[in-house]
UniProtKB/Swiss-Prot annotation:
Pfam families: Oxidored_q6
Keyword tags: 4Fe-4S, Cell inner membrane, Cell membrane, Iron, Iron-sulfur, Membrane, Metal-binding, NAD, Quinone, Translocase, Transport, Ubiquinone
InterPro entries recorded: NADH_UbQ_OxRdtase-like_20kDa (IPR006137), NADH_UQ_OxRdtase_20Kd_su (IPR006138)
Membrane topology: Peripheral membrane protein
Major place of residence: membrane
Summary of the function given for this chain in its UniProt record: NDH-1 shuttles electrons from NADH, via FMN and iron-sulfur (Fe-S) centers, to quinones in the respiratory chain. Couples the redox reaction to proton translocation (for every two electrons transferred, four hydrogen ions are translocated across the cytoplasmic membrane), and thus conserves the redox energy in a proton gradient.
Upper classification of the organism: Bacteria, Pseudomonadati, Pseudomonadota, Alphaproteobacteria, Rickettsiales
Compartments, as annotated in UniProt: Cell inner membrane
Entry EC number(s): 7.1.1.-
One GO-annotated biological process of the protein: aerobic respiration
GO molecular function: 4 iron, 4 sulfur cluster binding; iron ion binding; NADH dehydrogenase (ubiquinone) activity; NADH:ubiquinone reductase (non-electrogenic) activity; quinone binding
Natural source organism: Rickettsia bellii (strain OSU 85-389)
Official protein name in the record: NADH-quinone oxidoreductase subunit B
GO annotation, cellular component aspect: plasma membrane; respiratory chain complex I
Length: 174
């Protein structure tokens, strides 16, 4: 019974695709759109920010992946935390994160943002930005290269395609 159903479904898909129709799930379309139109907001705190700027320049060109840097957290859906996060800067990081619209993602760039890095034992350094905001992707290195950042962004795109779903809560909109 099950095999017969899947064979009929496959025949229908083939017949419709031959006529120029595309069959997919809404979740797949939303995942594709979200992953290919990330708008990062920079949170450059130290030398990793220079590599982040290089990744956006003409040699690597993050625009080809659909990424456009935005100056405001309200227009962004991705925060790239690049560099050493101090205890004084941690509340500002959280405030900016809270201002971002849903769905939102965070990429931690460099050893300092990932775990404190060279300054791990300093009294004034947060030992990883994941103590302040939830992190989706970690990019290692001191500082990580522009290629490493782009690879991390591509991994985030894969994660978004895998995990995204269309969620609508009618109670929130009334």
């Amino acid at each position: 019974m099950h095999n017969n159903f899947y064979q009929e479904d496959e025949l229908l898909n083939n017949e419709l695709s031959n006529r120029g129709f595309l069959l997919t799930k809404v979740d797949d379309v939303i995942g594709w759109a979200r992953s290919n139109s990330l708008w990062p907001m920079t949170f450059g705190l130290a030398c990793c920010a220079v590599e982040m700027m290089q990744a956006a320049a003409s040699r690597y060109d993050m625009d080809r992946f659909g990424m456009l840097f935005r100056p405001s957290p309200r227009q962004s859906d991705l925060m790239i935390v690049a560099g050493t996060l101090t205890n004084k800067m941690a509340p500002a990081l959280r405030k900016v994160y809270d201002q971002m619209a849903e769905p939102k993602w965070v990429l931690s760039m460099g050893s300092c943002a990932n775990g404190g890095g060279y300054y791990h034992f300093s009294y004034s350094v947060v030992r990883g930005c994941d103590r302040i905001v939830p992190v989706d992707v970690y990019v290692p290195g001191c500082p990580p290269t522009a290629e490493a950042l782009i690879y991390g962004l591509m991994q985030l795109q894969k994660k978004i395609k895998r995990t995204t779903g269309f969620k609508y809560d009618a109670r929130k909109n009334h």
